[in-house]
């Protein structure tokens, strides 16, 4: 079992990161733009080095993101299965407009993401 990792003390970026079953869940928080994406990129790189399974990004506390996040998710997807939970109308629209909704699946819970991503992986 891999350990939980805390990031950013609840600020913008990755506020929590931990293994849940056979997936790793990273909670993103705040307004992710150029000023804060490096936090997400570094946290993801750490997880990719330490954990062999799928990554699930929890977006429930994300108030803004731009195409940098979509690019990051697609880059991560080339290395591991990726799923999203806690999307909102803004995120759903961003995925639709960028044509990435089909390759970045959304789920109702970490458990649903785990079931689908471990079956697909």
Task: Enumerate the predicted regions with their spans.
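Amphipathic alpha-helical interaction surfaces in cytosolic regulatory modules
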Residues: 34-104
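Short acidic-hydrophobic, aromatic-tinged amphipathic segments that line or gate anion-handling sites
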Residues: 103-112
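STAS-typified acidic loop motif
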Residues: 2-45, 61
């Amino acid at each position: 079992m891999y350990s939980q990792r805390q990031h950013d003390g609840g600020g913008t970026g990755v506020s929590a990161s931990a293994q849940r079953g056979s997936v790793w869940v990273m909670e993103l928080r705040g307004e992710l733009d150029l000023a804060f994406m490096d936090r997400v990129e570094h946290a993801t790189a750490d997880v990719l080095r330490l954990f062999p399974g799928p990554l699930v990004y929890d977006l429930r506390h994300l108030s803004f993101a731009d195409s940098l996040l979509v690019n990051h998710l697609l880059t991560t997807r080339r290395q591991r299965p990726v799923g999203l939970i806690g999307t909102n109308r803004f995120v759903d629209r961003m995925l639709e407009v960028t044509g990435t909704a089909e390759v970045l699946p959304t789920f109702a819970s970490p458990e649903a993401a785990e079931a689908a991503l471990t079956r697909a992986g």
